[in-house]
Amino acid sequence: MSDRIDRDVINALIAGHFADPFSVLGMHKTTAGLEVRALLPDATDVWVIEPKTGRKLAKLECLDSRGFFSGVIPRRKNFFRYQLAVVWHGQQNLIDDPYRFGPLIQEMDAWLLSEGTHLRPYETLGAHADTMDGVTGTRFSVWAPNARRVSVVGQFNYWDGRRHPMRLRKESGIWELFIPGAHNGQLYKYEMIDANGNLRLKSDPYAFEAQMRPETASLICGLPEKVVQTEERKKANQFDAPISIYEVHLGSWRRHTDNNFWLSYRELADQLVPYAKWMGFTHLELLPLNEHPFDGSWGYQPTGLYAPTRRFGTRDDFRYFIDAAHAAGLNVILDWVPGHFPTDDFALAEFDGTNLYEHSDPREGYHQDWNTLIYNYGRREVSNFLVGNALYWIERFGIDALRVDAVASMIYRDYSRKEGEWIPNEFGGRENLEAIEFLRNTNRILGEQVSGAVTMAEESTDFPGVSRPQDMGGLGFWYKWNLGWMHDTLDYMKLDPIYRQYHHDKLTFGMLYNYTENFVLPLSHDEVVHGKKSILDRMPGDAWQKFANLRAYYGWMWAFPGKKLLFMGNEFAQGREWNHDASLDWHLLEGGDNWHHGVQRLVRDLNLTYRHHKAMHELDFDPYGFEWLVVDDKERSVLIFVRRDKEGNEIIVASNFTPVPRHDYRFGINQPGKWREILNTDSMHYHGSNAGNGGTVHSDEIASHGRQHSLSLTLPPLATIWLVREAE
């Protein structure tokens, strides 16, 4: 036989060190005719088969006892479809040869992936069930440009890296292979000889499903069908919509009482979804559900960005949960972590033996606070991986919004770093220009492709224009968490009321910058961990005063301009900090009616009242929607303002942050007439003292605070009241 393969090539193939298997394996034209070569470890006999007739065309010669076979097909000149009949351990198996198939990735896809402009890279990369030339199987593609060899290993080939080495597309650095017979539900990984000659096993960055920790294999499963955005869901995200978010960690919202094990996605659909709906929330926000190895990271150190965690069920179970939320009228927000990833060896870290996804210099690529690695946003393929992921969750799962975690750590090169521990940008500044461009590009693409979905930024500095359009120099987010408001108001509320008069500005300062961004007011998971205490436990005084303070604070928060966010457990005033390894303290709501029931009823009424009255949400980001009536009564710690809708209808909000009732408290108003109390956090319904105004109160033509008409109210102790003007 001519064109005999060099012994060194055979040795390299068998040892798994040969980078170009398609140049040797499969069908080739040689001077002797059509030659078929195959690497089939442990096989004893191999024939080339005519598929239509089952006729044996030629027996391949075993050139190496370790499994290398070769043979010339007599009387054939042109390539044709064939199969291999392989005898393993005395049993014959009919297989299709993976090395008879041509390149998989189309030239346009390869070009877009290399340019980093492929809108949906997950439709090409990863594992996809496919049929090629009438043969069913799975096509695998992975970006690893510096690897010396990459193989697919899995349940279909005994996890043997010799059996399925891949083809390198040099123009893109992508390795590809179609494996006949590999099917949905099978586990796989990529085995590679990395740039340094080390053998590595890597999970698929684009895996759509993965094993539950501590196992780390990827799972073949098809792309989920696209989810249509409904007009109702789009409207629920808009600036003038009532948005009240229930933030949830699925692993600890509620657990099975007999074994402390998690509820499944489907059980959560049956329990969490109706509860959130009954409580009057409009949105569910889920702490990250991308696959992650460490429970204690709460999902914020993901290794499988395209795979919903298997802790609570399958990918389809997660889709069922989202569908249930939508059916209940709830939009779903997913916490998304494009800022960093963990150092676990099976995942993205040094993926092909080089710093492929991360920066090579630890001053740029290592986050010392979290022992994680920082994405290299300036690398086109990395940015494309992340932008595509954002679109994937919205298009393929029906996620309505993404809340982007730790934006400040992305956009500042010196974030949490001392002098000398960071590298300035090309202009000598501290901004991470590549990260800023990545965020702008992500928000632009989402706005173009899925216009009803929105993004929210957790950004802890005063970086300008986070929620402003890109053409105005902004980052292009729709909303930004108002962490300054949260810190100021909690600092105020934890004070003994006798000292609050000296810190009055902590409640008023937020309005000085309120219209610089589109704010969400967050009482998030970060405020009930790491020794900060629960929200309830931060309130001063005895038990009665703690609950009264909390109710007054919630009444203030729900009335203040901005969308609302409350972490689970806070809606019924859980007394201890959040523990991700245990259920919420639902036992607090067992037995007779108590203060916890009162807070729960209040939050429900706040949500329902807030949603019903447009004045409370329609003009959150328009100065016309808010006006102070009493802003300077710091001696009595009283604050009064109005919220206003587009038609000029007003709601008066009055807060008394001392335990002293204020009788006959007079203040000027804009609209004379009869005002009805629609919410009172001191109501007996919420286990308050039930002080108030007997339902309605009429204005007087008595000048006050620079206005011709005024109201005289009873302001209950440690309470917030809302009043609406009734038609004459």
Curated annotation (Swiss-Prot):
Gene Ontology molecular function terms on file: 1,4-alpha-glucan branching enzyme activity; cation binding; hydrolase activity, hydrolyzing O-glycosyl compounds
Q: Which class of enzymes does this protein belong to?
A: transferase
Report the EC code(s) recorded for this entry. 2.4.1.18
Give yes or no: UniProt keyword Glycosyltransferase.
Answer: yes
Q: Which Gene3D superfamilies match?
A: Glycosidases, Golgi alpha-mannosidase II, Immunoglobulins
Respond yes or no to whether keyword Glycosyltransferase is given for this record. Answer: yes
Q: Which GO terms describe its biological process?
A: glycogen biosynthetic process
What function does the entry list?
Answer: Catalyzes the formation of the alpha-1,6-glucosidic linkages in glycogen by scission of a 1,4-alpha-linked oligosaccharide from growing alpha-1,4-glucan chains and the subsequent attachment of the oligosaccharide to the alpha-1,6 position.
Name this protein carries in UniProt:
1,4-alpha-glucan branching enzyme GlgB
Q: Which organism is it from?
A: Escherichia coli O157:H7
Q: What gene is this protein translated from?
A: glgB
